[in-house]
Amino acid sequence: MLNEFKEFIARGNVMDLAVGVIIGAAFTKIVTSVVDDLVMPIVGAITGGGFDFSNYFLPLSANVTAPTLAAARQQGAVFAYGSFITVLINFMILAWIIFLLVKAVNRIRASVEREKAPEPAAPPPEDVRLLSEIRDILKQRA
């Protein structure tokens, strides 16, 4: 069973997947930084500085009178839709950035493939060429 496990791990697909997961984890940090540190401040400046909806909520009981979500949750049940809106906006920005990166990578790959000129087909060996000529002559006689 140990040998089977070694063979499974040594296959290229498993190693490629492991590398992809590790790079994906590192890439997530980069994209999160782009969203939090570059995109969100610009959006906040355009919208007047307030782009954090995390304190938007609806109280579900009369006991809830707190102005912040954390305090309101301590007082009773709340419908915290603001956090969801913030996460949804962050996700949309993240998805857009990833889309743009994938599109750029695909464009680069396509240009690299276009630069590679297809190699001309090698001429057939002499015996194949002679057999083709014989075949063509026999077709003409028939």
Curated annotation (Swiss-Prot):
Transport listed as a keyword: yes
Top-rank lineage group of the source organism: Bacteria
GO cellular component: a single term: plasma membrane
GO molecular function: mechanosensitive monoatomic ion channel activity
Key words of the record: Cell inner membrane, Cell membrane, Ion channel, Ion transport, Membrane, Transmembrane, Transmembrane helix, Transport
Segments forming a coiled coil: none
InterPro entries: Mechanosensitive_channel_CS, MS_channel, MSC/AndL, MscL_channel
Annotated transmembrane regions: 14-34, 38-58, 82-102
Membrane topology classification: Multi-pass membrane protein
Location(s), subcellular: Cell inner membrane
Family: Belongs to the MscL family.
NCBIfam families: mscL (TIGR00220), PRK00567.1-4 (NF001843), PRK13952.1 (NF010557)
Function in brief: Channel that opens in response to stretch forces in the membrane lipid bilayer. May participate in the regulation of osmotic pressure changes within the cell.
Self-association and partners: Homopentamer.
Protein name per Swiss-Prot or TrEMBL: Large-conductance mechanosensitive channel
Organism: Sinorhizobium fredii (strain NBRC 101917 / NGR234)
Taxonomic lineage of the native organism: Bacteria, Pseudomonadati, Pseudomonadota, Alphaproteobacteria, Hyphomicrobiales
